[in-house]
Amino acid sequence: MVQDLPTPIGAGIYNIYTGVKHRDELAGASMPTVAQLGLEPPRFCAECGRRMVVQVRPDGWRAKCSRHGQVDSVDMEAKR
């Protein structure tokens, strides 16, 4: 399923909420609580770790990586 996600938030070596490489994280610190609840949009690109431009809207969010393109929460709902 993670392989089906767009590049900025799909399988990558960086955490999309903290920007830290997965192997550098402490156990249990990989996802903030608000992200676990689905209330926080991704802030970092999973592929390159760059900070993304994130726009939060009343109906969702849009995140754009300067190198890997854009992803929208509407696209995520379609994959559920």
Swiss-Prot record:
Which segment of the chain is annotated as a signal peptide? none
State the UniProt keywords alphabetically.
Biotin biosynthesis, Iron, Iron-sulfur, Metal-binding
List the molecular function annotations (GO) for this entry: iron-sulfur cluster binding; metal ion binding
Q: State how the cofactor is bound.
A: Probably contains an unusual Fe-S cluster.
Q: Enumerate the cofactors the protein uses.
A: iron-sulfur cluster
- Please provide the Gene Ontology terms (biological process) for this protein: biotin biosynthetic process
Keyword Repeat tagged:
no
Question: What is known about what this protein does?
Answer: Required for the activity of the biotin synthase BioB.
Which family does the record claim for this protein?
Answer: Belongs to the BsaP family.
Identification of the protein by name: Biotin synthase auxiliary protein
Q: Which organism is it from?
A: Mycobacterium leprae (strain TN)
- Its gene name is bsaP
